[in-house]
Amino acid sequence: MMKGQHRTYRKISLPTLLVVLLMPFAWSADAQQQFISEGKIEYERKTNQHAFLDENNMWDEMAKKDLPKFVTYYQDLYFKGNRTLYRVGREPDQVQRKSWSVLDPDEVIASNLDSGSAISQKSFFMDTYLISDSIRRIDWKISPEIRKIAGFDCRKATGKVLDSIVVIAFYTDEIVTSGGPESFAGLPGMILGIAIPRMHTTWYATKLELVPVKESELTAPKKGKKYKGPEFRHDLHDLLKNWGDEAQKMVWQLEL
């Protein structure tokens, strides 16, 4: 510096200084955030079967004394990229004693999220059906509420299915596959929790396994009487239209 010249210093505000100092930590946090596109998720499906029973029916009231309040099953979701397969998981710890209106969750659902298509295998009345359909589109409303599920921070979303049934979902964007249990999909990440108050049923992930997923674990089922989705729903409603409220509950379960 030449004699007579003065160095000028730019004043830095405290907020600016804090931003500069914290930037390396922000980069580090971003680098550590994981984005998962392959693995296996276990869901616990729990139904309040006492709520399924008719309180005005003498036989149903008697059944409540003999049946446990909740029926619990486990189901697995294999996912890789934009393909998923949902199927029966491990056996519950105890034999599940249940009402006839609570169906066994023995379906297999293979979904291709890119094409928006799904193939489902469902059993009902000793018959097996193979149903080709499009993935249900739900007008999800996302809210700020966060819930921790299976170690992930999950954001809440609500929507409706089957015209009027409210669905509450919790999803994480750390798992980039936009699928979920049953045939639920369409959120910006994996759905780890579902609650359907009208069906008195919840699905919550219990764990994620970061394992390679084989092609055979994503292969769509092939056995069963072949149906298109609208055709299956029409025949199902026609079959059960005279069965009353109990039949409606079974229809909801089969159409998920």
For the regions a protein language model found, what residue spans apply to each?
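Extended soluble regions of mature proteins
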Residues: 32-256
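Bacterial Sec-dependent N-terminal signal peptides
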Residues: 1-36, 254-256
